Regions:
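Glycine-rich phosphate/pyrophosphate-binding beta-alpha loops
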Residues: 23-24, 68-72, 228, 234-237
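Conserved phosphate-binding/catalytic region of the ribokinase-like
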Residues: 85-86, 137-251
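Acidic, amphipathic alpha-helical patches
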Residues: 53-54, 115, 144, 183
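Short gly/ser/thr-rich secondary-structure transition/capping motifs
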Residues: 43-51, 104-110, 138, 209-210
C-alpha cells in the first residue's frame, strides 16, 4: 500500500527495501476536538541496520529528514544515527522531527537521552510546544529555541496548534499565526507542515538555507501553516494531506 501511494504521487522509491516482517501499524483514536491518542504494532522498521543504508544516496541528497520514531529501537537507532552522520559530514541539510510518542519508549528518561543525541547533526528541527520541555527542560519558547540553537540547530520551528508557529533563525524570532480552521482530525498535520517547509526549502537550490532571509522564511511558514490547516479540516492521515495546487489555491 505505501509503495503504491508513493508511486501515485510521483515519489522516487528506488531506495525502498522490502522486508519479510510486516509494516508497523499505528492505531489512532481521535476525540471530539480532533486530538489524537496512539497505539502501535511495531514491524520491519525496527529491524533496519546501518548496512541497509544507501550511504551514497544520503550524501548526495539536498535534504535528509528523519524522525525520532526510528530511535526507539536498538538496531534502528544505529541505522538512523549512521545515516544522519553521513549526510551531515557531506554537507547535506539534515532535518529532524522529534515526535514524542510515549507508548514507544520504555521511560521518559530513555526518550530524552535518544531524542537529544542527534541534535548536533541537525540543521532544521520541527517540534511541538509539548515536546519543547522534553528536549530543552523549559517550556519558554525563546529560551527553549535558544538552547536548541546553541546545540547547532540553525532553524527552529515550534508548532503551537491553533496559535500558529514560533520560529528562530539566525538569532531572530517571530510567530506566524495559524489559519482559522474547523478541525476534523489533527492526524498528519505536523507531517504536512514539515513536508511543506522542506518542499519550499528544496526549491531554493543545492544549499537550501544559504541566503535565506527572514521575510522569505516567514512566507515559507505561512505556506506550511496553510497546508497543515487543510489537513486538519479532513479526516485521516495521508488521504487528508492536500496537493500543492490545493495549498496554493487556498492562499
Amino acid at each position: 500500500y505505501l509503495r503504491q501511494v508513493l508511486e501515485e504521487n510521483g515519489v522516487d522509491h528506488s531506495g525502498l527495501q522490502i522486508a519479510d516482517s510486516p509494516t508497523t501499524m499505528a492505531i489512532v483514536s481521535v476525540d471530539g476536538t480532533g486530538e489524537r491518542s496512539f497505539r502501535f504494532i511495531r514491524g520491519a522498521d525496527c529491524e533496519m541496520v546501518p548496512e541497509d543504508v544507501d550511504e551514497a544516496l544520503a550524501q548526495s541528497s539536498k535534504i535528509l529528514h528523519f524522525g525520532s520514531v526510528s530511535l526507539t529501537q536498538g538496531v534502528a537507532r544505529s541505522a538512523t544515527i549512521f545515516t544522519a552522520r553521513a549526510a551531515h559530514k557531506a554537507g547535506v541539510l539534515v532535518s529532524y522531527d522529534p515526535n514524542y510518542r510515549p507508548a514507544l519508549w520504555r521511560t521518559k528518561r530513555d526518550a530524552l537521552e535518544w531524542m537529544t543525541l542527534p541534535l548536533p547533526l541537525v540543521d532544521v528541527i520541527k517540534l511541538s510546544d509539548e515536546e519543547l520541555p522534553l528536549l530543552t527542560e523549559t517550556g519558554d519558547l525563546e529560551e527553549g529555541s535558544r538552547r536548541l540553537e546553541k546545540q547547532g540547530v540553525a532553524l527552529v520551528m515550534i508548532t503551537l496548534g491553533e496559535r500558529g508557529t514560533f520560529c528562530r533563525w539566525r538569532g531572530e524570532t517571530f510567530t506566524v499565526p495559524a489559519f482559522p480552521t474547523r478541525v476534523a482530525d489533527t492526524n498528519g498535520a505536523g507531517d504536512t507542515f514539515m513536508g511543506a517547509v522542506l518542499h519550499r526549502l528544496c526549491r531554493r537550490g543545492e544549499k537550501p538555507l544559504e541566503g535565506l532571509e527572514l521575510a522569505e522564511l516567514r512566507e515559507i511558514v505561512v505556506f506550511a501553516n496553510r497546508a497543515a490547516s487543510l489537513t486538519c479540516s479532513r479526516s485521516g492521515a495521508i488521504p487528508a494531506m492536500p496537493t500543492l495546487a490545493e495549498v496554493e489555491g487556498a492562499l
